[in-house]
């Protein structure tokens, strides 16, 4: 069974830089437990996956996103 190749959302939209203040976008790329979803699942290319990880970590540090889920 051949799987369909996932396309990078950020490349398709022509995004220059991922902003750590854009919480709606960042929440789409973290799991319920708070982990960053890997690129092989989302289809995000390497350039944007690095920016995404940095943005999520920055947002966590500034308490915009939680590190883990609510217990």
Curated annotation (Swiss-Prot):
Keywords: Ribonucleoprotein, Ribosomal protein, RNA-binding, rRNA-binding. It comes from the Bacteria. Disulfide bonds: none annotated. The keyword Ribonucleoprotein applies. GO terms for biological process: translation. Transmembrane segments: none annotated. GO terms for molecular function: small ribosomal subunit rRNA binding; structural constituent of ribosome. InterPro entries: Ribosomal_bS18, Ribosomal_bS18_CS, Ribosomal_bS18_sf. One of its GO terms (cellular component) is cytosolic small ribosomal subunit. Belongs to the bacterial ribosomal protein bS18 family. Binds as a heterodimer with protein bS6 to the central domain of the 16S rRNA, where it helps stabilize the platform of the 30S subunit. Part of the 30S ribosomal subunit. Forms a tight heterodimer with protein bS6. This is Small ribosomal subunit protein bS18. It comes from Dichelobacter nodosus (strain VCS1703A).
């Amino acid at each position: 069974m051949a799987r369909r190749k996932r396309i990078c959302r950020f490349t398709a939209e022509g995004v220059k830089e991922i902003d750590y203040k854009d919480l709606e976008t960042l929440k789409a790329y973290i799991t319920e437990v708070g982990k960053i979803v890997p690129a092989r699942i989302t289809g995000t290319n390497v350039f944007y996956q690095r920016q995404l990880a940095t943005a999520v970590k920055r947002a966590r540090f500034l308490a915009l996103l939680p590190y883990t889920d609510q217990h």
